[in-house]
């Protein structure tokens, strides 16, 4: 009876295993797991549709086709359970065993498994040390392999061609044995003694002379070690029998019309069985060798096709000429098992409809159409109807719901009460793309969405659709309410600023009501209280924007301790009514633009908490909509005021362009310089017109009551929209009322002729034609961008998915030092913004008093940030994810604040995925190459000079300079800086100075704000002389190292250095002492080598002064600002690719000297004060940016080019690399105005740096050049040190995100990412065990993820009610769902 009830048991919970192992199957294992041998290729009988015996669908092997019924029909029903029918041999059991029972095919001859043969590197080839080509010759019966050399001196597994074999037989008198095909290879593999081979290979590695040999031996050793450790035998890579997949997994479905649809696998199996049976028959008949060989080769090919069709030779195609899908194809790619069914499951019941705006909803609500709610909540409604006694059976409940009786609607209202639903808008780029709301029933068929959550969903109401999902179990409802409710997601996880912020109309309304209007009705009145203002406004006595004074009770004036009288406007007092108590009036007593609203909500969240913020957000929404309606703002043609000075600016620009054209014609400048200057002139003209236009728009002139003309802030509609941040930008307005400006070609170059018209004037045909260029490119880019951005996010998620907060404090003493971010002397990001929400590493002390401002290990919150900024601290040491010592995962202290919640991060938070989403989500806003606005090119006029911003003394930092004739300092080195120091000695500004710049002020001279500090030519890289003297050319031979280039337009020529074939020729300019009587008497006092492409600026024998330009290297004509910008740049950084022309950097500090050229490369020698000098070879023609006797620091580039991240890591270490990567990625996002917190980028960089490469083995079991996880290496070292051995030494490795994902320790995660076959092949050989630590593996295995509420420590918690009365109000979910995970109650860890 027990046994009978077990039949109705629920399926078992998938939680009872803790790891999964993969390995190579032995023939015995295959046979042991099989339920019988498949002998015939037949499938089912075409008349009876019953499976053929011993065929591919045989019921005897795989189980009955119908539940509890044997094939011949003798035994039916449950009572015969477990009996084996004596007539047809079928066991009477449920038919679902046909999904799990394997069969097998015994092969007449062994065949090689194609994965181990062809998946590079070939594992069989590696073990036997045979090349893949030779191996294939043996396997496909074109050559022999020696299987037993006896004492002939031949090598084991030596490959012999047919002729060579026959010769050898005669030579060695038939003393050895050789064979063909997989059988021979199997014998060779069987003969391998792994221990002995491993020993031998280790020895070979020690003795290896060449690097290549060592690498090859290391690879072989790796394979041998893998087999040794895992207990797999090499000969198992050759199959003697093949497992047959259960028939339900390769179904045969009858279509109408008597045809069948079948899985490709059946065809593939059928070919194998046919060929196998034919081979058996031929062997029994003792057919000629050549026929048998051919049949064996065909069997090998059939098995290859079954395992991986198309891997070798042409893919076998089915009747419709389409390649058949093999077992490997079932796993691979987007439509394979991993990504289609295991990672991307579909939900079985959800709704979807168009969205419309629901302005009267509260923030936690969404409007759900009644029809949809009825369908989604069906089971709950049936349950309630039965409970209420309206119906007695489910069937009658169903009828009642179908008829939509009034009782049903009442029950529905009750069921949906406090039952959250989840709304999702595709594409879900970050976690805010799915949020929970409480449904409100509405008529109609569209879902209503709250306007404030649109930003998070990136939704608009032009026909977007959204999906509705219903959490069923109590636990999932709790999680939806506590973690996913829209009211709990006010802050963005990417940057910690509010994401629930009024936009568009709401912003406009609030902006309008907080503006001041001069001389409005009631201007200058004084009120006793805010309430009085409300009364006056309602009575129509004062205007909304009138400037008034009000006595505020809760604000005391500093002087008299009395309630202060505040100057404000009527609108701001009205806005104050919706403000929570704790938020000060000063935060809205200003013109509220969108930026101010973000700050307001932020301040409210910090001061008043979540609940008040939600209420405030809703009230702002209502107020905003109301007042934008009252404002009645619209736009018309006349709002676009074209500035009067426009034509004058354009005329003067045209004149300048003519002037430059003349200079070019006279040969004073090159074509490239001309192009750049022209572009600059127009860029500047556009800016000037835009500036004039904006000044015009932003000011109105009105008559004051006493008849004076007064300029006041404008109420121009277009200006208000842009100024408030509601819609539009300065650039768009510029195109409407200024001039459209320069356009770019699709290639990114800028077209010289700008569009001088604007949209209000209208474009002529030529201008319109030029416009289409940029506009079309924009559309093409958008399409490409979406796919690229999605792929970047996928790679990021994959690499970071196992970065989870696993402990509170790892106890590290290491961290990063953070300073303010400056660019060109401007502070782009204050130190406060960068350290907010991080944890201090050491005590932060006040530099003046020495008091502790922030104790070590404390989170730096808003108040502490203010304290640090006020104290003027410039460098702060903080804990960082990069230096976290946690072995698996990350600790909470190193991560700091959970940006979306505003407090230190919780245990189990999946910070890796959050980081990946935060970086990937704005990816679609990044550009593919260049940044356009409707195709107009934006390029800043190149900076050519530096102006001081403050008054102070000039200080040179690390500058070598010579003073030229005019008395200016000419900078002769790179990386020098100029600072301006105020009276107290503090640095007010600091600027990097380029080589060749003219500094107008000497050290310690005083500058005034606005004075020019330095100037330079941005378009050429000068080569300067440091000494005065006569010019002599060396190796500058026309036609060999130099050519005179004639400019067709100007008819003038210039001398340009070209690449010479003669390696000994090194074009140079020598400066000879001009005074023959002096000590140096005509000898060389300066020598300058010229790179390819340099233009010589001096004539031979002319006289030059110190600081003069002797040659110029033209810079590339500038494309739009960013060489590889946008998305490709971010991908390049995260993939850690070497840049195309990367700069060689020095690894040590020292003095530069030039050595003799070697192999056509220049030799640069860096000599340190102590120790060996280092030599660097630099390709000819590359410009060397250091000079003889310059002092360089480690990590400085010796030539032009971009930095190679691998070099930075090697030379400067992890922290510098992290700083470089974070800054570079941030720069791309900053250009687009996207905010991302540094810690997200750090998290990804940590994942890229998690492996090390072994340099010295010590006494460990590691191999040299082995790459492994850092913590595995640390554990191994600890083990060895504990025993008193020598630890191994390793260097950190920087892997790109794709590489890092593929090298995770979890083979399931790696296989589901890319290169599935390769990953699984390697894992099988190593007998890998997946401990299921990351998120992805657990999703694939169908378990809860080990993050958040799924952490193992919450797994076995039981929910226990304390008092009886607690039990009543909880809505009971239908039992069918609730008992799914009996021992797996989750508790929200929010209370933690």
Swiss-Prot record:
Name the species this protein comes from: Geobacter metallireducens (strain ATCC 53774 / DSM 7210 / GS-15)
Cofactor note (record): Binds 1 Mg(2+) ion per subunit. Binds 2 Zn(2+) ions per subunit.
A Pfam family found in this protein is: RNA_pol_Rpb1_1
Give me the residues that bind Zn(2+) 2, please: 810, 884, 891, 894
Which cysteines are disulphide-bonded? none
Q: Which InterPro entries match?
A: DNA-dir_RpoC_beta_prime (IPR045867), DNA-dir_RpoC_beta_prime_bact (IPR012754), RNA_pol_asu (IPR000722), RNA_pol_N (IPR006592), RNA_pol_Rpb1_1 (IPR007080), RNA_pol_Rpb1_3 (IPR007066), RNA_pol_Rpb1_3_sf (IPR042102), RNA_pol_Rpb1_4 (IPR007083)
Gene Ontology molecular function: DNA binding; DNA-directed RNA polymerase activity; magnesium ion binding; zinc ion binding
Q: Where does Mg(2+) bind?
A: 460, 462, 464
Task: Report one GO cellular component.
Answer: DNA-directed RNA polymerase complex
Name of the protein in its database record: DNA-directed RNA polymerase subunit beta'
Indicate the segments annotated as coiled coil, or none if absent: none
